[in-house]
Structure formats: C-alpha cells, structure tokens
C-alpha cells in the first residue's frame, strides 16, 4: 500500500513539474515569436517576394517560352566548344548553382557533379535561382541594372565592354545577361573560334536556325519565326530568361513564419534569426529590405577576408605576381581601392551549395560561418586540405595579409558568439532559408532526356556522394 502511495506521489509530482515547465515554455515561445515578428517587420521582410514576380514582370510566365529556355539550357549546341552548357555550371543538382569549389567549364568530362573533371575557371558559379530579383549579377557585379531594379531598364543595363550599355533596350537584366555566356571562352565558347562576341553569337544562331526542331519550337512562341524569320539573339535571351524566371524558390520556413505560420521554424532557428538580424550583424551586408528584394544581400561589394586559392590547372589568368590572387571588383573598375572586393552572396538555399565564398575555399557551412565571424583570427589557421577540397586546389594559398589589410570595417573586430549561439545561427542559415522545392530530388525532372539538337545530354549526378580528390 505504501509503495502505491509513493508511486502516486511521484506521478503527481511529475505531472505538476511537467505542467509548470509547459506553462513556462508558453511565454518563452510566445516571446520568441513576438521578438522575431517585430524584427522582420522592422526589416521590411514579408515572406511574399515570390508572389511579386508576375506583377513586376507585368504579365504571367510564358510556359512554352520557359520550356524552350530549359531545352537550350541543357543543350551543348549553344557552346562553340561543344562540351558545356548553362546547366553544366548552374546545375539542378545544387539548386542551380555550382557543383564545384571553382567552376569547370570547357574541356570537361561530360559529368555534372562531384566527379566533374577539367581545367578550372576563376570562381565558383553563383546560383541563378531567384536571380530574377537580383539588381546585379556575378561575383564582381559586372552586369547591373543602373536603376537598382532588374525589372527597370530606364537607367540602362551596364555591362563590360564591348557590350557596355547596348543591351539596355531589353526588358529585364536576365534577358540581357543571356547574351553573354555563349561568348565566354572558358565557360562554353572555347578558344578555337577566332571571331568577336557578335561573331560567336552569329555562329550560335546559325546552328539553331539549321535545326528544324528548334525552328519549330521558336516558331511556337515567336510567330515571325513560323513565317520564315530567322531566330535572333533577342529571342534566345528571352527564352533563357523565361526559364530563369521559373526558378523562384523563395518559400522557406522564414517566409512562412513571416506570413503567420509560427510553427514553421524551430526555437533554435528563431534564436538564430534574431542573432542574424541583431547582434551578429549579418543583415548589414546580407540585407532584405528595399532593392535587396528579400534575397539576403545588399548586392554591394566588400572585402570579406576570404582565403585565396588557385587551381593547379586553369584556363583563366589569375592576378598577382604569383598568379594566385583574385582582385575581384578591381578587374571591372580598374580602381586599386576595389581590390579583393566581391558582391555579398545572396543566402537563400545556402545549404544546397557544396562550397562557400567566391572561390569555394570552404566546403562546410559551419567552417565558413566560423571564419566569417572572425576572419583575422581564423585566417592564421586556414588550410585547403582541412576543407576536403579537391587535390588540384590544395596548392599554396595566395597572400592573405593584403586581403586582411583591406577587410571591411564591420568584420575587423570579429563577432563573439557562445557555442549555443553559433549553433542557433548555423541552424537558421542551414534550414530556415531553404525552400524544399529546390532540393535535388525536386529538380531532377527539369533535366530533359533529350534535346532538339540530338546531342547527348550531360550526365547529372543527383545522388549525393562523397567528394573525391583528383
């Protein structure tokens, strides 16, 4: 009888304690929700940017045109070197970003994924997912809408020479940017064709116009082609851009929380969000308001103190006396004050990347974050080998001291976090900004089994596998 009473007493005690703890958790959870909601409101984050695309385009998506762009995206007919496509570097296996630390363009082995081989370019390929909302493009911001709005060409669309401002008549920055990749020697064009950019484009068009299947597809969305007009590069650019417009993946847990679903995020993710928008200071560069379009970038160029790595085999010319540096924005402006500056990376779907920073010098998000919180301290200990980079990237690193001397003032003092705070911030970055529609298994169907040219489609490695050294 006594043991029964003891059991009953213990049970009652457990119930009381559970009730007390549960009641205490309600205010804590509610306070966390209220704090995060207030912070998002202050930063003008609505979680609704994905719904604004058609309004800003002034029309609905043209699905036929987007599908044409998809076929072009994966067809090597658009590259004069005959071995790479847009999809070879902007891969659906990684959220339409790179599969590599530093991109591999021409002279590749026909594989897109961890086993891709070939000479390296200079930087990691940025994602095109959500790029419809980016006011400038590329790590050195070399393609930009001068109005700060990619949907507004009224102030001009700025490109390096020889294009300059000549593409400003096109309706969106992405339509204009589509004129460039076919002309990039190290990406798809190769070095055998001797003509200039216009001549390269003319040759791509000659190829497309010679394929009846492409003329039929273009004719379905451009009636003038159906009646005999040749395919032109405006049409090509519109098709590529329309496919990119379809790649909007901006419905992450944080978006759903902002729209009212308080259960969309875990408590650690919410605490991490408060750090991101608050004491950790991340939002000062990875901003969401105004022309940032909730993309987690101010789209400005900064010196982040990134370690300098260069591949053993490259088809690019690296900077510096030892050809192991990347001068970044200076390449475009010619101003030494812009040396080592790179555009703040948009952070949506960050966890789908296999590597981080402009040169993929980190293969693990937690290491990239730890470094970024205190570059001066962690630069002393950086080693490519510790990041499991491919063996062709394990050579001596470029000089770091001149990079640190130019470090953005916001990064000079470092940001101290407790281990728990670090884990919370990492959880926010890894999980709260990820739209599950961008996961590889949900994008696999976008790779066509065949393309109108009849050429073989590159081999995409959708199954996650361990990185192999070269």
Give short role names for the model-derived ranges.
Residues 5-6, 17-470:
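Periplasmic c-type cytochrome electron-transfer domains
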